Amino acid sequence: MDFQQLADVAEKWCSNTPFELIATEETERRMDFYADPGVSFYVLCPDNGCGDNFHVWSESEDCLPFLQLAQDYISSCGKKTLHEVLEKVFKSFRPLLGLPDADDDAFEEYSADVEEEEPEADHPQMGVSQQ
């Protein structure tokens, strides 16, 4: 996929997230993204026909630790698309953006109807002597 097509994918992705594509550099194949409050990162796109993966990084010390999830994902087996990489970055930055963690939402919905049962008093608990 040529760089302009990748930039189009990035623009479309931005329309569904708080991020803006603030700069593109075709010679470096770099795209810079920004969202309030000061969340920024960039993506280096692999050359056509090259075996390299995408690379994500941030020049912000506050943002960099949150990118670990996305970096691990990119380095895992299999080719990733730009959209997949950007989605993983968005998920990584949700806490910085003040958004709930997507996984937490699913877990809360699933466990919301579960009622805790009180242990019955007439059954002895294991390991507790009855005297």
Swiss-Prot record:
InterPro entries on file? Maturin (IPR027892)
Q: Name one GO biological process term.
A: positive regulation of ERK1 and ERK2 cascade
Phosphotyrosine modifications at: Y34
User: What does the PTM comment state?
Assistant: Phosphorylation at Tyr-34 is essential for its ability to promote megakaryocyte differentiation.
Acidic residues bias: start-end ranges: 107-120
Record annotation: effect of changing Y34F: Loss of ability to promote megakaryocyte differentiation, enhance ERK and JNK signaling and up-regulate the expression of FLI1
UniProt entry tagged with the keyword Cytoplasm:
yes
Q: What induces it?
A: Up-regulated by NF-kappa-B RELA/p65. Up-regulated during 12-O-tetradecanoyl phorbol-acetate (TPA)-induced megakaryocytic differentiation of K562 and HEL cells.
Q: Where is this region: Disordered?
A: 107-131
Family listed: Belongs to the MTURN family.
Role: Promotes megakaryocyte differentiation by enhancing ERK and JNK signaling as well as up-regulating RUNX1 and FLI1 expression. Represses NF-kappa-B transcriptional activity by inhibiting phosphorylation of RELA at 'Ser-536'. May be involved in early neuronal development.
Q: What is this protein called?
A: Maturin
